[in-house]
Regions:
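Short acidic-glycine-tyrosine-enriched beta hairpin
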Residues: 66-86
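Short beta-strand His + acidic residue motifs that chelate non-heme Fe in jelly-roll/DSBH
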Residues: 42-44, 62-63, 84, 90-96
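Conserved short histidine dyad/triad with adjacent acidic residue
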Residues: 13-19, 30-47, 88
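Glycine- and acidic-residue-biased ligand/ion/polar-headgroup-sensing regions
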Residues: 37-38, 46-67
C-alpha cells in the first residue's frame, strides 16, 4: 500500500496569511506551513494535544492560556518549537521586520478530526474554538501594538470594534 501525500494552498481571510496544508498517509499525519506578514497577529484558537509548531523564519511571541485564566507569553525565533497544551487557547504574533514562517505538525486532521480540529475555525460565540478579534481581551491587541512600536512597525490587522463583555 503506497503512502499518499496531498498538498493544497489556501489563503486564510483573517490576516492575509498564506498556508500550504499537508496531509500524509491518508491524513493520519497532517500539518501546515503558514506565512504571516509583518505587523500581523492571528486569532486565538484551541484544539487537542499533539500539535507541534516550529518557527522556520522570523520572530515573535505566542500567548497561551487555559479557558478562564490569564494568558502567558512565550517568545520565539527561528528553530523554536512549542506545543500548546490540550485545549489551551493560543495566539501567534509577528514581531519581526519580515514575514514569519511556521510549520505545524499533528497526528490528526480533516479525515480524523480528533482534538477539536473541526471546531477550530468556528467562533467561540457559535460554540467553536476560535476567539474572534472582536471577542478577545483588548489588552492583547494593546500589548502587541506597544511591542510593534518598539520595533518601528505598524499594526496591519484591520481595526476592531470590541463586543461588550458580560
Amino acid at each position: 500500500m503506497s503512502s499518499v501525500i496531498t498538498l493544497f494552498a489556501r489563503r486564510r481571510v483573517s490576516c492575509t496569511e498564506h498556508n500550504v496544508e499537508i496531509e500524509l498517509s491518508s491524513n493520519t499525519l497532517s500539518g501546515h506551513i503558514s506565512e504571516s506578514p509583518v505587523g500581523v497577529y492571528k486569532k486565538a484558537h484551541r484544539h487537542g494535544p499533539g500539535a507541534y509548531i516550529i518557527t522556520l523564519k522570523g520572530s515573535g511571541y505566542s500567548l497561551m492560556w487555559p479557558e478562564g485564566q490569564k494568558w502567558e507569553r512565550f517568545d520565539w525565533g527561528p528553530l523554536s518549537m512549542m506545543s500548546p497544551p490540550n485545549r489551551w487557547f493560543h495566539q501567534h504574533f509577528n514581531l519581526g521586520k519580515e514575514p514569519i514562517r511556521q510549520l505545524a505538525l499533528k497526528g490528526w486532521g480533516q479525515k480524523y478530526p480528533i482534538g477539536g480540529w473541526d471546531q477550530m475555525f468556528k467562533s467561540t460565540e457559535a460554540g467553536g474554538d476560535m476567539i474572534e478579534f472582536e471577542d478577545e481581551d483588548p489588552a492583547i491587541r494593546q500589548m502587541y501594538v506597544e511591542e510593534l512600536r518598539k520595533e518601528g512597525i505598524e499594526l496591519k490587522n484591520l481595526p476592531v470594534t470590541y463586543r461588550k463583555r458580560a
